[in-house]
Amino acid sequence: MTNNIFKYFNIKELEKFGKFYKVKKEYEIPKKLESKLILVTSINPTPEGEGKTTTLIGINDCLNYFGKESIACLRQPSMGPYFGIKGGATGSGKCEIQNPEKVNCGFTNDFYAIEAANNLIMSVIENEIYFNTDLEIDPQKIIWKRCIDINDRSLRDINYQVSKNTKINSSFSITAASNLMALFCLAKSKSDFKKRIENTLVAFSKSNKAIYVKDLNIIDSIMLILDDALKPNLVFSQDNNPIIMHGGPFANIAHGCNSVIALSCGLNKAEYVLTEAGFGSELGAEKFINILCRETNLVPNLVVLTITLKAIKYHGVNNSNNTSPLTDEKEKIDIGFNNVIHHFNLLKNLNLNVCIVINKFSDDNKNELDYLFNKSSELTKTVISTMWQDGASKNKSLFETIIESVQEPKPINWTYDLKDNAVNKINDLSTKVYNGATITYSDLATAKLKDNENWIQDYYVCGAKTPYSPSIKNEYMDTNKHDIHVEDIEINHAVKFIIPIFSKTFLMPGLPKVPNAKKIKINFDKFKYE
């Protein structure tokens, strides 16, 4: 079967890149939008898996199979979690992207380019210090950080020598959480990216003068490094439908959405455009709405909340309110379903149109699945997807549910007023989304907000917290009100993010005791997973 790429793209718009394509032509988001935008999100993830990417690829295949023009947009996987604990991010079963081993491990080198450009900025800043140039950069007032696309906890806190008499305390972020990745994904075009990176605050001088990237005189070098990376990539599903894959910020420590450049391309090409926001709706979807939609004036016509029977039972069993182990399967579903209700209400409070897709596992118990379907149908329109096992031809009900659920978007009820002060915005996010009761701040967080108050008046809030619970605590599986403590504050001036860091959340992940890197086996004759 040949791929459907030329159904949507002219050959002159594309350039071959190994087994993939890059889109050379730049697109703007249409002023009169005719495409329908569908956002795919989920409940809080569990070790059982939710299949959000699988569901997105499945819906895209379904829409194409039954005669609609549809393109999906996805984030590029990071090698950090791929070699860490999470593994790849290319779907599975009959909803897996072609060439997953290539996509998961380096792909078209976009992450390397972002990493190199990001680190060039830091290297030049320190070079200015080494040669004591006229910029007179204060070594203790550098805002920018290095990044690398590998989980490495030893890089969370480092001390190193810049010159004979100057040492610096700093840290690395993982590339997916870097300042440059966020800008890469929110920029509307190459020219927009160039303008915004030039005017990004990176340090202060010894006389407290602001130092911007343009002061370093390296903007042409940055754009040279990122020339190919800023072109979105095309990959294909098993049904040979095109998927635009571009950018890859994490949702728990960044904003968790693929690039605006990719969305712009899709919205110019197809009747339906699907996109995914990372982790549960309290992270990726919230940031998609409060950050990306504000940046682009887009509003999704439909939000798909992905759930699974296994995940809901996991949330039920691990609910912190349980006084004794649960043995009744329906009771596990009843208690775990509170997580679904929480995410559904969060999305409805934003004034979004929501349907639920139950991603069916092949070994799910039919009676339990029917029980879950009935509970979910009391909330909103619900459908069971068997895309993983059966593919598009046997999922007409999924196609029909998606088509019937798409509506004209309504005005968004924003979580916070962008013009409000930083503390009020963080408090609104904490109470309305994370179920916070009392919000407190460490002395460090308070001091950073005070020091930056003149710079962050119209900044977005991009929370950094655990993805495994609606709250800020890993072990907290229920949805009760709880106290929230802001440990630290990071500022990303490239995209105007205030990043409140809750509990023990790190911008550089670590590896587990037995990382996934030890488990990967490759047949080198065919370069395929064993």
Curated annotation (Swiss-Prot):
Q: Which domain of life is it from?
A: Bacteria
Q: Does the keyword Transmembrane apply?
A: no
What are the binding positions for ATP in this chain? 46-53
Name one process (GO BP) from the record.
Answer: tetrahydrofolate interconversion
Q: A Gene Ontology MF term for this entry?
A: formate-tetrahydrofolate ligase activity
The family annotation for this protein states: Belongs to the formate--tetrahydrofolate ligase family.
Q: What is this protein called?
A: Formate--tetrahydrofolate ligase
